Amino acid sequence: SLLALYIIFVLSSIELNAFQTIIDSFPKALTQFIAGESGIDFGSIEGFLNAQIFTIMAPIFAISVAVNSGGKSTANEESAKSLDIILSAPITRESFITQKILSMISKTFFIATVHWISYFLMCKFFSENISAEGLFAICLNLFLMGISFGMISVYIGTLNGNSTNAIAVAGGFALISYLIANIAPLVDSLDFTKYFSLFYYYKSGDPLKFGVHNWHWLPFVGISLIFFTISLIQFRKRNLL
């Protein structure tokens, strides 16, 4: 909230077009690498938030929380040799891991909601026009992308029982996904690979300006459900001794 207050206060006090003039002098490849296929647009409040907040900062917050929580969901107790004791209580493995996943989802939801409410209220307070639907759309994508990487982390944790490995692998996937989404459009022969990146579906179509995309939320839901299912299966059959 304080970050949103600071950023919107500064934006309300300066002429954004001056920044855009500077950005326009940069090579297109550089702006696409930094901010993705849509490039950098400092000519509007949406463009500034898109480039400065929702390209790197917000995803780092959401993915870090989700991956950290997901990686520790079962691996922490397993590493501490306390998981078998917990499961000796009247609770099934499925119930245990589901509760941990719901905890991860709630934390990620909190991060996304704070971003939506903070920037919406600050823009209203400083009389800056911003689309409530667009802000909701980018925060929804932020939430769904965080959960997707969080579920990958949960699954890795059920494979080896090591939270450090789970967090590192899922975090690595997130970094690779970001690089693919930003680099692929710069090379014609690699352009098709952007469709394998969750970051592409996160920002493609410019949700902050145009709202929720018709189907770009589907890859997030699909990946989350797939990794939720295989995590349940793997955890159910895993030997905890």
PLM ranges: what are they?
Residues S1-L3, N162-G171:
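Alpha-helical transmembrane segments and their helix-start/interface "positive-inside/aromatic belt" motifs
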Residues L5-E46, V169-L241:
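Terminal transmembrane helical anchor/hairpin motif
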Residues L5-I7, T98-F149, S153-V154, T158:
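Secretory targeting signals
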Residues N50-A75, G171:
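Long, hydrophobic alpha-helical segments
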Residues I63-G70, S118, M151-I152, L198, ...:
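Hydrophobic/aromatic residues in alpha-helical transmembrane segments
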Residues V67-L87, I101:
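Transmembrane helix boundary and interhelical loop/hinge segments in multi-pass membrane proteins
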